[in-house]
């Protein structure tokens, strides 16, 4: 609430449009694209006055929230009066209007109260610096950077001001903001990214007060640290306390803190997950499939088959499991008429996926986010999948004028037959597979992926992203007992 109110006030003070404010306070700083005004539309603008009044009446008189409470009050009250309460009403700071029968997104002018076509390129040049970190944005010399700096300095220092009143566990506070509001990093993680000492200097240079807890972090060096491979957090008494996490939590970041990969190249790494289980982690852009991560898959299977390993999990911490093949690589080869290289790429993929399918050890995929094209084919060639609930699975190749080349077509046809997803008759399964693949249908969730046949009825679904790899490892250990590779399927086509 403080962040929203502070951002509203800064938008008015810096004379920005709602699109400019959201463009700067969304993805460039690690927040969802709804940012501030889009978020108010989502939750309901009519709730804002009630929440603000409740905080004003209950917070101590010296709380910094009082300095910004009620920012944009006239605009908000006018909108509520006219029925502009957000997405549940006629619209809010944004609305959809029709122009010649086409839907047009419009944004509200905070000064005049009128609507105009929303500017989809409203960000300032400093927004592009977000990839380099928060400090890079704040160090820029444009109006957008000044706006972001004002909002972040006050909002982040307010989070430090509220320790220990809200909680003395900053890890819990950061977790609440990440899970509850889908922030990429919590406020204390963001201050560590900027640097605790840098935060103090920026506050002092702008004549702002430095909260005692932030000053303590600057003295200690940071809010978080690593001790013997475990995360530690700063407590209000100055001690660095090991963050206690459920034993069900496991991420690649945990493995990286505790050791080094068993093997790696520019596209993928092989990790020891513990309990004799290997993990293959992709780290290409969008985790796209290329020859080098296929090489790591083959290496992992070879290691598992020849060593004392129970099997291989394929997964990562990234937003997306695998967005498909590296089509840029394929297009580059095609433009050079390097047809043999293109053939080799396709053949390597087919060999790799068949190796996953018929390995002497079980292979489990831990899917999350986009699992498209070659990524969906990986899932279908594994013995089992442990899917995060927000897994988007589909064979989308026809969308760019190609067909699945690594076994997805025959695997999906087999699943349609096995799971009885089509009507009876000699052409039922073929027609169903042709329809799904030919129209590039994508499952919008793990449950839908199961109902469409991309996942099997026995595949698992995990709700908590931090538990996904742990659940996948458990599933692999279960199926490793007495494991035998599947028999090749015979396809009888009409």
Pin down the residues of each PLM region.
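N-terminal glycine-rich phosphate-binding loop for ADP-containing cofactors
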Residues: 1-312, 316-319, 328-348, 352-361, ...
């Amino acid at each position: 609430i403080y962040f929203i109110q502070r951002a509203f006030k800064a938008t008015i003070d810096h004379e920005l449009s709602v699109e400019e404010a959201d463009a700067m306070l969304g993805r460039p700083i690690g927040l969802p694209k709804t940012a501030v005004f889009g978020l108010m539309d989502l939750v309901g603008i009519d709730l804002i006055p009630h929440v603000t009044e409740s905080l004003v009446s209950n917070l101590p008189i010296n709380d910094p929230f009082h300095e910004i409470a009620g920012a944009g009050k006239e605009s908000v009250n006018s909108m509520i009066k006219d029925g502009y309460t957000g997405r549940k009403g006629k619209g809010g700071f944004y609305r959809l209007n029709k122009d010649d029968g086409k839907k047009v997104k419009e944004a509200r002018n905070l000064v005049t109260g009128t609507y105009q076509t929303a500017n989809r390129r409203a960000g300032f040049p400093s927004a592009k610096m977000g990839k380099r970190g928060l400090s890079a944005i704040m160090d820029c010399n444009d109006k957008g950077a000044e706006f972001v700096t004002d909002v972040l300095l006050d909002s982040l220092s307010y989070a430090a001001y509220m320790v220990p009143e809200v909680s003395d566990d900053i890890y819990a506070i950061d977790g609440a903001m990440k899970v509850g509001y889908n922030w990429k990093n919590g406020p204390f993680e963001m201050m560590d990214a900027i640097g605790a000492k840098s935060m103090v200097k920026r506050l002092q240079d702008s004549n702002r007060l430095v909260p005692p807890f932030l000053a303590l972090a600057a003295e200690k060096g940071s809010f978080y640290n690593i001790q013997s491979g475990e995360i530690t957090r700063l407590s209000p008494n100055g001690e660095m306390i090991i963050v206690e996490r459920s034993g069900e939590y496991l991420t690649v970041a945990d493995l990286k803190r505790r050791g080094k990969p068993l093997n790696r190249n520019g596209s993928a790494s092989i990790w020891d997950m513990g309990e004799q289980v290997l993990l293959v982690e992709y780290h290409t852009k969008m985790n796209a499939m290329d020859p080098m991560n296929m090489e790591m898959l083959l290496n992992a299977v070879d290691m598992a088959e020849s060593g004392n390993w129970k099997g291989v999990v394929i997964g990562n911490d990234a937003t997306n499991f695998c967005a498909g093949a590296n089509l840029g690589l394929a297009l580059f080869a095609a433009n050079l008429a390097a047809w043999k290289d293109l053939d080799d790429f396709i053949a390597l993929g087919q060999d790799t996926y068949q190796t996953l399918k018929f390995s002497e050890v079980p292979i489990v995929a831990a899917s999350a986010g986009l699992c498209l094209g070659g990524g969906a084919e990986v899932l279908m060639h594994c013995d089992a999948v442990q899917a995060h609930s927000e897994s988007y699975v589909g064979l989308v190749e026809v969308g760019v004028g190609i067909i699945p080349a690594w076994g997805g077509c025959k695997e999906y046809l087999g699943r349609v037959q096995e799971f009885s997803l089509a009507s009876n008759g000699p052409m039922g399964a073929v027609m169903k597979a042709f329809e799904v693949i030919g129209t590039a249908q994508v499952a919008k969730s793990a449950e839908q992926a199961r109902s469409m046949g991309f996942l099997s009825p026995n595949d698992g679904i995990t709700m908590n992203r931090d538990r996904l790899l742990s659940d996948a490892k458990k599933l692999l250990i279960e199926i490793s007992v007495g494991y035998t590779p599947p028999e090749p399927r015979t396809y009888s086509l009409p």
